[in-house]
Amino acid sequence: MRIKNKIKKRIIELIELAYITARKGDLELAREYIKLAEMYSRKGRIKIPLKYKRMFCRKCYTPLITGVTERRRIRSKILIRTCLICNWQRRYVLSRNKGSNKEN
């Protein structure tokens, strides 16, 4: 169990490091960090947390930085994220929280 926690921490560190590296302009090194994190995830059979999974393109492993490597569009309550490197698109349905309108 302790090993899985260490692997998960390392995966998160690598993805965050990739994001920082991409902001500085070195996309190739950032891709390598993400590929390494993916490999750790597969070998250790550990899921990458959703927050971090959405930080990179699943096709070319480029960190998605809005305005630099990613374009975001909203069309009829659907968020469309497009990687500007490989044109990969991912769509997310935008919905209101159902619990926010409840009365006490």
Swiss-Prot record:
Its EC number is 3.1.26.5. GO terms for biological process: tRNA 5'-leader removal. InterPro entries: RNP4, Rpr2/Snm1/Rpp21. It comes from the Archaea. Pfam families: Rpr2 (PF04032). GO terms for molecular function: ribonuclease P activity; zinc ion binding. Gene3D superfamilies: 6.20.50.20, Immunoglobulin FC, subunit C. Its cofactor is Zn(2+). It is found in: Cytoplasm. Zn(2+) binds at residues 57, 60, 83, 86. Keywords: Cytoplasm, Endonuclease, Hydrolase, Metal-binding, Nuclease, tRNA processing, Zinc. It is an enzyme of class 3 (hydrolase). Binds 1 zinc ion per subunit. The keyword Oxidoreductase does not apply. It catalyses: Endonucleolytic cleavage of RNA, removing 5'-extranucleotides from tRNA precursor. One of its GO terms (cellular component) is cytoplasm. Belongs to the eukaryotic/archaeal RNase P protein component 4 family. Part of ribonuclease P, a protein complex that generates mature tRNA molecules by cleaving their 5'-ends. Consists of a catalytic RNA component and at least 4-5 protein subunits. This is Ribonuclease P protein component 4. The gene is rnp4.
